[in-house]
Every structure is written in structure tokens, then in C-alpha cells.
């Protein structure tokens, strides 16, 4: 089985590096985007298995990126996990309203991150076999 490819979208390089190391240690491949525009391009060209999307980014928020990814026939099938430091039902509702598949609140442990990604991968695999 090929390594799952995860697109990490975050404007903080240190966060991208930490997440990338966690994913690598779990046998996953990571691809990085540091802004929303790059995320849209990379999602289309790389076809990741899951997108880990920070909500609070300059120029284009994660909400906008998620909405555009879900509107694009080439990327709408990719599960998106929104990452936010907002611990509110409003943040969760807004993520869902733009098409996110899951929400992960900061701070999170590497184990929580990997478990959430594995859940999304399992759901995708289940949908492909039915």
C-alpha cells in the first residue's frame, strides 16, 4: 500500500515542520502549503489523501480555502480536517458549513492528529469499497 499523502496548510513553518515529522514517523508522506492560494494549487496537482487546514491564515482564511476546495470537482472528494485554536461551537459549525469533514482544536497531540487522519483515511477507503 502506498504511503498516504497529507497536505499540511499552515502559515507557520515551525508548525508545518512539527506536523510533518509526526506524520513521517507514522509512515505518511507530507506536502506543505504556507498560504491558501498555494494550498488550492497543490491540492489539485498533488491529489493528497487528506488535507490538514489551518483556519487562521493571512490573505485567505482556511474557511475560504475549504469552500473553494469543496466547490472544485477535482478536489471536492478530499477529506479536510480544519485546525483551529477556537474552542467554540461557532467555529465547529462554520467549518462544517464550508464542507470540512472534521475539526481539530489546538493544542493537539501527535496521537490525536494521527488518529483523526486515520479516521478520514478509513472513511475514504470504506466509501471506495461500497
Annotate each language-model stretch with its function.
Residues 46-52:
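Active-site beta3 strand of CheY-like receiver
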